[in-house]
């Protein structure tokens, strides 16, 4: 579900838009803080306070939702391809995160 952007401060709105456009890239607290022009610690606190979740929890959620869509739309897709497409270098780490998020492995999710 989409977060209603207008209820957040403009810096948090900018982060949400940036993450949704760049979830496939290597995102770091420093790179995001530089993008919005804030100190990294302040950004981290502000994002958590405004949204109720941590920045990397949010990024992971965006990535997992996109991964789920990819798997649902192409059940033959390789885990390695999905992992890379949503910003994970390591398909095994991706699979663990996917299972944490969905309660199923990517292949179980594809079969469901």
Model-identified regions with their sequence ranges:
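Membrane-proximal linker segments that couple transmembrane helices to downstream signaling/catalytic modules
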Residues: 1-38, 49
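Terminal helix-turn-helix DNA-binding modules in bacterial transcription factors
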Residues: 17, 21, 49-89, 111-112
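Short helix/strand-capping hinge loops at secondary-structure junctions
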Residues: 22-27, 54-55, 105-106
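Residues within helix-turn-helix
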Residues: 30, 41, 77-81, 91-92, ...
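Core residues of bacterial helix-turn-helix
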Residues: 36, 43, 86-87
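Short hydrophobic/aromatic patch on the recognition helix
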Residues: 42-43, 47, 93-94, 98
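…primarily DNA-binding HTH/wHTH and HhH modules…
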Residues: 96-112
């Amino acid at each position: 579900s989409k977060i209603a952007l207008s209820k957040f401060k403009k810096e948090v709105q900018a982060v949400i838009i940036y993450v949704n456009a760049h979830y496939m890239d290597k995102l770091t607290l420093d790179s995001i803080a530089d993008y919005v022009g804030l100190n990294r610690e302040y950004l981290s606190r502000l994002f958590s306070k405004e949204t109720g979740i941590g920045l990397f929890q949010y990024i992971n959620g965006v990535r997992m939702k996109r991964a789920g869509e990819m798997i649902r739309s192409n059940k033959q897709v390789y885990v390695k391809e999905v992992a890379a497409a949503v910003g994970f270098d390591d398909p095994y780490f991706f699979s663990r995160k996917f299972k944490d998020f969905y309660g199923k492995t990517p292949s179980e999710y594809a079969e469901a």
